[in-house]
């Protein structure tokens, strides 16, 4: 294989990861850079923004907190909420976590370094803990009459750090990085983040799904599960109990597709009848 062929092969094996990074960096830069002939593409932040001066986008979790705090949404914010909620409801809520959220780049870096350093420490934590954090954040919102979670939200602090060099933002990002690196694998996104918990519920029946229609080519190596940030979502597919990942925790990150050397997995948009996984047998 030529050097160029080797490069192409290496890029193809990371096609989903590279695609996500391009999208994430574009979104970050859209809020920061004045583009030629266009100017600033997005004004605001990931909580509520206006794109190209015409398209309002509002985080549904922010909208929910606003309602719980007793604040009525402005018409533009309501329209933005419907647009964003509709998108994630159709395609899968946790697409936000792997394709939009900038914190994902921080936690992915921690995971990569953890693997390179062969760090074994992994504190046991229930994945349901993030649902408890979600519930607590809404309770605090009701009691305080404010968007309580936004005082601690790493996503908000990340954008403040980029725009105004916030010391608090730097400390939170460093803490999350060290937590994921030293304490537990995928600790923040996989066990604690209430935003991810909210989007998992919102996009439970999203139609963009990982499928194993070529299950006969599966080598049974388990490499897809090892790289998956939410490995429990792949268990029914790998054990051949279903040919489609239907769990709301799936982030559609494509890590399993990048890792699968046999092409047994694919990402497909299913617009047919709702299903929870069609039983299959090994060929």
Swiss-Prot record:
Domain of life from the UniProt record: Bacteria
Ranges where the 4Fe-4S ferredoxin-type domain occurs: 208-239, 241-270
Cellular component aspect of the GO annotation: plasma membrane
SUPFAM superfamilies: 4Fe-4S ferredoxins
Keywords: 4Fe-4S, Electron transport, Iron, Iron-sulfur, Metal-binding, Repeat, Transport
Residues at which [4Fe-4S] cluster 1 binds: 218, 221, 224, 260
Pathway where this protein functions: One-carbon metabolism; methylamine degradation
Gene Ontology molecular function, alphabetical: 4 iron, 4 sulfur cluster binding; metal ion binding
Alphabetized Pfam families for the sequence: Fer4_10, Fer4_5
PROSITE patterns in alphabetical order: 4FE4S_FER_1, 4FE4S_FER_2
Cross-referenced InterPro entries: 4Fe4S_Fe-S-bd (IPR017896), 4Fe4S_Fe_S_CS (IPR017900), Electron_Trans/Redox (IPR051684), NapH_MauN (IPR011886)
Chain sites annotated for binding [4Fe-4S] cluster 2: 228, 250, 253, 256
Function field: Involved in electron transfer.
Name of protein: Methylamine utilization ferredoxin-type protein MauN
Gene: mauN
């Amino acid at each position: 294989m030529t050097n160029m062929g080797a490069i192409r092969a290496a890029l193809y094996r990371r096609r989903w990861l590279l695609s996500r990074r391009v999208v994430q960096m574009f979104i970050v830069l859209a809020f920061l850079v004045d583009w030629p002939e266009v100017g600033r593409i997005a004004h605001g932040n990931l909580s509520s923004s206006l794109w190209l001066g015409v398209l309002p986008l509002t985080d549904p979790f922010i909208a929910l907190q606003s309602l719980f705090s007793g604040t009525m949404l402005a018409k533009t914010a309501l329209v933005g909420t419907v647009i964003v909620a509709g998108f994630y409801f159709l395609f899968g809520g946790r697409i936000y976590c792997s394709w939009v959220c900038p914190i994902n780049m921080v936690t992915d870096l921690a995971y990569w370094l953890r693997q390179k350093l062969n760090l074994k420490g992994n504190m046991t934590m229930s994945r349901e803990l993030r649902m408890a954090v979600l519930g607590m954040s809404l309770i605090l919102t009701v009691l305080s009459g404010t968007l309580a979670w936004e005082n601690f939200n790493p996503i908000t602090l990340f954008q403040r750090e980029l725009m105004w060099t916030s010391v608090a933002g730097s400390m939170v990002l460093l803490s999350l990085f060290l937590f994921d690196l030293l304490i537990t694998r995928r600790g923040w996104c996989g066990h604690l983040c209430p935003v991810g918990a909210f989007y998992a519920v919102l996009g439970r029946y999203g139609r963009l799904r990982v499928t194993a229609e070529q299950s006969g080519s599966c080598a049974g190596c388990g490499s897809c599960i090892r790289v998956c940030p939410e490995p429990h979502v792949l268990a029914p597919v790998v054990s051949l109990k279903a040919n489609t990942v239907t769990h709301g925790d799936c982030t559609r990150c494509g890590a399993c597709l990048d890792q699968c050397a046999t092409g047994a997995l694919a990402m497909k948009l299913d617009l047919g009848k709702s299903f929870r996984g069609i039983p299959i047998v090994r060929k």
